[in-house]
């Protein structure tokens, strides 16, 4: 499996994880997948995340992560599949980590893994789907050395 991760920064790089961390988290989420491809991660400001959240989900305010799976039109053939885009709001991630008394790096890892699973088609709208997705997230994060993000502190 070959994966390319493009990182776009709309906030200062000093306030976000290293590109190598993003790549490690994406690869961990894809470890049991045979899919090769490309993913773009945009590290957004709060205003940009709020605009995108309103445009695509009709919800006010910034959210921590938005996932945009790429659907290839049937008339298009790609050498390297585009898996999709993730938009992660750096200020929301920092605030949530503080509020939830989590290490910020662990929260970033969780959100990247969560987003990649959405790009692969996982969802959490129904209880059974949520349990399956959360279980997979916990397993992936533990393989990276991070604690269960759903465990109460």
From Swiss-Prot:
Q: How is the cofactor bound?
A: Binds 1 zinc ion.
- Cite a single GO BP annotation: rRNA processing
The GO cellular component terms are: cytoplasm
Coiled coil regions in record: none
**Cofactor(s) this protein cannot do without:** Zn(2+)
UniProt-annotated location(s):
Cytoplasm
Q: What is its main location?
A: cytoplasm
Q: What class of enzyme is it?
A: hydrolase
Which Pfam family name is an example for this entry?
Answer: YbeY
Keyword terms, alphabetized = Cytoplasm, Endonuclease, Hydrolase, Metal-binding, Nuclease, Ribosome biogenesis, rRNA processing, Zinc
Q: What is its EC number?
A: 3.1.-.-
Function summary: Single strand-specific metallo-endoribonuclease involved in late-stage 70S ribosome quality control and in maturation of the 3' terminus of the 16S rRNA.
- Protein name, UniProt field: Endoribonuclease YbeY
Gene name per UniProt: ybeY
């Amino acid at each position: 499996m070959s994966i390319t991760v493009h990182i776009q920064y709309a906030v200062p790089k000093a306030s976000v994880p290293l590109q190598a961390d993003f790549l490690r988290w994406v690869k961990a989420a894809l470890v049991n997948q045979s899919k090769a491809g490309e993913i773009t991660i945009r590290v957004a400001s709060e205003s940009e995340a709020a605009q995108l959240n309103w445009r695509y989900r009709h919800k006010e305010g910034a959210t921590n992560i938005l996932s945009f799976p790429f659907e290839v039109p049937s008339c298009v053939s790609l050498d390297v599949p585009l898996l999709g885009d993730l938009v992660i709001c750096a200020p929301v991630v920092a605030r949530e980590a503080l509020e939830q008394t989590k290490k910020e790096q662990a929260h970033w890892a969780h959100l990247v893994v969560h987003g990649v699973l959405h790009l692969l088609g996982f969802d959490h709208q129904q209880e059974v789907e949520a349990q399956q997705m959360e279980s997979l997230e916990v397993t992936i994060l533990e393989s990276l050395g991070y604690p269960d993000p759903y465990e109460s502190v």
